[in-house]
């Protein structure tokens, strides 16, 4: 007579069922994550397109206004900058306590740390106070993009995490206005309503020493040195650092 089949232990059956359920849950999670990333990719593309059109329209309007002013023999008054990019170019040696405190407030604790700040009156006063230790100016859209794409790191659970995909950004900010890196670029470059949220959600950018080296750190930029306000010329400096 054939031997009777020995039934599997109940614990083994439960383990097998649990493993099947885990596999199915994992498969569903992977599928859901893939679908979310696909949807987010489409959203990011459409928003990037919208922002690009807005940037081009703004630039075209400025070009027209400059031409009209020139044709009438007038001087076109450029709008005041709303944002500044600030890079620390000197170390800690011989820094006065008050200046050290200001550098800490604007998160420039190390040499070649860089931040993007709203250029209001209090910030202008702080920048003047620590001017011998910084190079700053008015960033172009290309510079803001370069900083975020190449050197951007988010604050996630106290850790410094490199920006690698838009899902990181969506999960970090949990805000429908900030779901992709182009949203971050737009909020910063246009000084949007979430400017502070975005900048505070990132670590200061850590840049490299400029290719070709510095000129004279202890002399003002207008005197052939390095420190101080470079206005739009800061972009050429940062290209060498990013």
Regions found by a protein language model. Name each.
Residues 1-242:
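Core subunits and conserved enzymes of cellular information-processing
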């Amino acid at each position: 007579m054939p031997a009777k089949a020995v039934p599997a232990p109940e614990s083994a059956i439960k383990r097998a069922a649990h493993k099947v359920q885990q596999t199915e849950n994992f498969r569903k999670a992977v599928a859901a994550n893939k679908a979310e990333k696909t949807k987010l990719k489409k959203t990011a593309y459409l928003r990037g397109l919208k922002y690009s059109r807005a940037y081009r329209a703004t630039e075209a309007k400025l070009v027209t206004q400059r031409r009209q002013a020139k044709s009438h023999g007038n001087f076109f008054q450029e709008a005041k900058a709303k944002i500044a990019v600030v890079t620390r170019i000197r170390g800690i040696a011989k820094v006065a306590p008050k200046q050290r405190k200001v550098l800490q407030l604007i998160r420039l604790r190390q040499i070649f740390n860089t931040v993007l700040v709203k250029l209001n009156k209090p910030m202008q006063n702080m920048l003047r106070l620590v001017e011998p230790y910084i190079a700053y100016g008015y960033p172009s859209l290309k510079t803001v993009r370069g900083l975020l794409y190449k050197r951007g790191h988010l604050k996630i659970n106290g850790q410094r995490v490199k920006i690698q995909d838009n899902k990181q950004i969506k999960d970090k900010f949990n805000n429908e206005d900030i779901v992709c890196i182009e949203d971050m670029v737009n909020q910063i470059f246009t000084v949007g309503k979430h400017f502070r949220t975005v900048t505070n959600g990132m670590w200061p950018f850590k840049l490299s020493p400029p290719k070709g080296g510095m000129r004279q750190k202890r002399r003002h930029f207008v005197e052939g040195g390095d420190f101080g306000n470079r206005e739009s010329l800061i972009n050429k400096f940062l290209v060498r650092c990013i």
